[in-house]
């Protein structure tokens, strides 16, 4: 099981990410895409990253907006896995 991060560690790691915010035991970011098909294509790419990492975000799709939420359920909060996947997601944008 991944080790849950402290509040200080979470804040430090959030400083390395752009647009991700903490909401309770999750980090979250909304992406604005140019069209609905491009939003779906983005989600498919996120799915491949998530599957490879064995770590899956909650995904909310609303037309051209995609909101991703990351947490590590079995750790009961945020772990390095969440920040690693957030970084990978940002790299495909």
Swiss-Prot record:
GO terms for molecular function: 4-alpha-hydroxytetrahydrobiopterin dehydratase activity. SUPFAM superfamilies: PCD-like (SSF55248). Its EC number is 4.2.1.96. InterPro entries: PCD_sf, Pterin_deHydtase. One of its GO terms (biological process) is tetrahydrobiopterin biosynthetic process. It is an enzyme of class 4 (lyase). It catalyses: (4aS,6R)-4a-hydroxy-L-erythro-5,6,7,8-tetrahydrobiopterin = (6R)-L-erythro-6,7-dihydrobiopterin + H2O. Keywords: Lyase. Pfam families: Pterin_4a. Belongs to the pterin-4-alpha-carbinolamine dehydratase family. This is Putative pterin-4-alpha-carbinolamine dehydratase. It comes from Roseiflexus sp. (strain RS-1). The lineage of its organism: Bacteria, Bacillati, Chloroflexota, Chloroflexia, Chloroflexales.
């Amino acid at each position: 099981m991944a080790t849950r991060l402290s509040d200080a560690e979470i804040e430090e790691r959030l400083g390395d990410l752009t647009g991700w915010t903490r909401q309770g035991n999750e980090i979250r970011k909304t992406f604005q895409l140019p069209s609905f098909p491009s939003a779906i294509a983005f989600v498919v790419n996120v799915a491949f990253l998530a599957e490879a990492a064995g770590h899956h975000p909650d995904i909310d799709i609303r037309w051209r907006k995609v909101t991703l939420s990351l947490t590590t359920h079995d750790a009961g909060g945020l772990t390095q896995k969440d920040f690693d996947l957030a970084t990978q997601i940002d790299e495909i944008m």
